[in-house]
Amino acid sequence: MQLEYTVKGGGILRGFTKEDIAYALYELSLAPSSCFQDWLKDTASRINVQFGYVIRYQYPHHFVDDLARHGLIMRSV
């Protein structure tokens, strides 16, 4: 079953796993990093500075879960 998330601003992300969703965010990022794992860590750090949210970045599915928990992305039904 395909997952679908909406980001603030209306963009739609689709994938079969939460890792696919995290990677789609990485590909759309305006703050690229040399590798996906570095991007997860750097993005989690930026979110913490901007909003005070703690976003786990060690595993992509935790990253997506935390973004959704804080309302930064929304799972479509």
Positions of predicted regions on the chain:
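N-terminal acidic leader/helix
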Residues: 1-31
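Exposed boundary/loop context
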Residues: 2-3, 45, 64
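Protease-labile, long low-complexity intrinsically disordered regions enriched in Pro/Ser/Thr
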Residues: 16, 48-49, 61
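Exposed alpha-helical structural elements
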Residues: 20, 35, 39, 62-63
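Short linear motifs in intrinsically disordered/low-complexity regions
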Residues: 21, 43, 66-67
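Acidic, aromatic-enriched beta-alpha/helix-loop junctions
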Residues: 25-56
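Short, compact, well-ordered microdomains
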Residues: 52-77
